[in-house]
Amino acid sequence: MEKRDRWGRATEGTPKIALFEAAYRSWFRVEWEGLENIPEEGGALLVSNHAGMMPVDGGLVQLGVEKEAGRPVYMLAHHGFFAFPYVGRLLNRFGTVVAHPNNAHRLLHEDERLVLVFPEGEKGPVKPTSERYRLQRFGRGGFVETAMRAQVPIVPIVLMGTEDTTPTIARISVGDLHYPITLNFVIFGPILGQFAHFPAKIRARVLSPIDLVGRSESRSVVMDHAESIRSEMQTALDEMIARRESRWFG
């Protein structure tokens, strides 16, 4: 019987999906820089930009950090994804946990794990193509409070290429969830279009860790830190875009 940790993750390393690993290497051709900024031990909150219908960015970061830096990554996801039959258990198996302050604190502070969050939330994946690579507001700074309370550093990870794999052209809303309608959906149809991604070259840059331990947790200070981190990531992303010669070849 497969062994799992208390979060439901398979304990024999990240379960391997051959097709996804092949896509990581040969389809998206993911390249990293700044991996020395990933802490070798202890908890850390990884913060990244977010994009696309059925976004692969989370899985790419999880797989990449484990392959390149040797540490597993737990990802926090909206509770709505766990409402579908069997999906929740499958997500848990690959290290995805319901996004909740208590879960984040236990992973970071008690278990000293790397935890990945996307502060843009749904605003990232559902933004129009005209806003491509413009980072949306980082909520109310909840991720900053999470890192402060867990006494761990924040490590920004900037992804370039993910928004070209599934360009958003519209969106629909179901309850409190919003779903992007992508160009892939239009070309490949409602089912295949959710999974077929264009072969954009993806680059990931890990920025220097940000230590906020001991800082004031007042709302205004938290919001200032969140905006400062968003601005730093946007600047890095702008630099990466400026250097890029082709969205398909990097």
Short names for language-model regions:
Residues 1-15, 106-250:
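Non-catalytic C-terminal accessory region of glycerolipid acyltransferases
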Residues 10-30, 67-72, 85-93:
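A transmembrane-helix-recognition feature enriched in membrane-embedded lipid enzymes
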Residues 19-50:
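Helix-to-loop junction immediately C-terminal to a conserved catalytic motif
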Residues 25-32, 96-99, 187-188:
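Short gly/ser/thr-rich secondary-structure transition/capping motifs
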Residues 27, 41, 70, 112, ...:
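Sequence-level motif detector for i,i+2 pairs with an aromatic at +2
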Residues 33, 47, 76, 118, ...:
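Residues in well-ordered beta-strands of folded domains
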Residues 40-104, 109-110, 121-138:
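Catalytic core of membrane glycerolipid acyltransferases/transacylases, capturing the structured
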